[in-house]
Swiss-Prot record:
Its cofactor is pyridoxal 5'-phosphate. It comes from Acidiphilium cryptum (strain JF-5). The modification N6-(pyridoxal phosphate)lysine is found at K240. This is Serine hydroxymethyltransferase. GO terms for cellular component: cytosol.
Amino acid sequence: MNQQSPIANISRFFNAPLAETDPDLAAAIGRELGRQQDGIELIASENIVSRAVLEAQGSVLTNKYAEGYPGKRYYGGCAAVDIAEELAIARAKELFGCAFANVQPHSGAQANQAVFLALLNAGDTILGMSLAAGGHLTHGAAPNLSGKWFDAVQYGVKREDGTLDYEELERLARERKPKLIIAGGSAYPRFIDFARIRKVADEVGAYFMVDMAHFAGLVAAGIFPSPVPHAHVVTTTTHKTLRGPRGGMILSNDLDLGKKINSAVFPGLQGGPLMHVIAAKAVAFGEALRPEFRAYQKALAENAKVLAETLVEGGLDIVTGGTDCHLMLVDLRPKNVTGKAAEASLERAHMTANKNAIPFDPAKPAVTSGIRLGTPAATTRGFGPDEFRMVGRFIVEVLDGLSASNDGDNAAVEAAVGAKVLELCARFPIYR
C-alpha cells in the first residue's frame, strides 16, 4: 500500500481546498450561499458583510493567541494583531464619538455580561425592558443569566400604542432603586428618549446602560439618536445594522469606568480574544466611516418605512404604527395567521423572517401572533423603495394565501411568489 510522505501530507494540509478535504461541510456552506443569493433576508438582526470583512475574518489571524490588550499581552508575537486591535479601537471611538472602546467581547450577550461583571454584584437590582415588550434576553429575562443572578425588574410598553412606557420605568426605578437601568431591545422600533432615562437614573443613583445592538449603524450615521452622551456605558453587537462580523463591543466616555470594563472582559469573563474577528471589526468600522455608509443607513431607514406602509395597505397592523429604524413588528391577527405559520410559509417562498411575540401577545411564545421584519440585508444588496414595495406585496400575498387556506396548504401561492422572489434576487446578485 502506497503511503504519502509526511511532506506531501503537510503540503495537502496547507493547500487542499475545503471541497476536497470535507465535501459534506463544503456542500452545506454552498447550500447556505445559495439561500442567501436566491432569497430575500428579512430577519432584522442579519446583514450581508463585504468581501473585505470575510477576508479579514478568514485570515491567518485565526492562528494567534493574544490574551491581554495591545502592548500588554501575555503572549509574544503580537505586533501584527496589536495593530489590528488598535485600528478597531481607534475607528470605533471615531465612529461613535466616545473616549473608550473595548472591541474584544465575542458577542453582544458577552458585552452585556462584562458590564454586569464590572458594575454589579450578584443579587443587585437591575431594571430592563421585558422580552415580551421588545427587550432582550440579557436584560433580565427569567431564563437568562441576567434574570437568575440579579433581582431583575422589567418595564414594558403602553397597551394603547405599543410605545415605551416611560412613566412605568420611572415609577419602578423610584420604587426599586436599581443599581443599573438598561435601555434598548431586540424588537422595539421607535426612538428612545435616552436623556429622560438618564435623568431618572441619576435621581435614583443607578448606572445607565444602553444596548444599541440593533440600531448601532443608524447611530453611527447620525440617523438614530446617539446614546453615548447620555449613558454611562453602551454595548452593541458589531453585525446587524453595523454590517460587520458577528461580535460585541463596549463604549463609554468614562475612562475610569473603562478600566473596570477592560478588567471585566479580560481576565474577568473571557480569555483569548478572537483576533481574526477583531480584524474584521476594524474593516467594518473603517467602512462605516465612509460617506457611502451614511447613505446606506438612510436608505435602510427609508426602506423600512416603505415596507411598513405597504404592509398596512395590505391589511396588516404594525406595532406602534410604524418604525423609526430598520425593523418593524407585524401583528398578524388581522389575517388570522400565526407567526409560526407565517415564518414557515414565507421561507418556502424564499423570504426569511422570524416569528416574534407582539406586546401582550395571547399566543404561546413558540407560536406568536407576529413576525419581526428588517431591511438591513436586502438594502445592502441594493434594494430600494420600489423593491421593498414589491417585497411588501409578496409578503401580503403569501399571508393572504395562508389566511384563505383551511388546511394550511399554501403551496401554490408560495411557488408563484417564490418565482417572483428568485427573479428579483437575480437582479441584485451577491458574492459573484
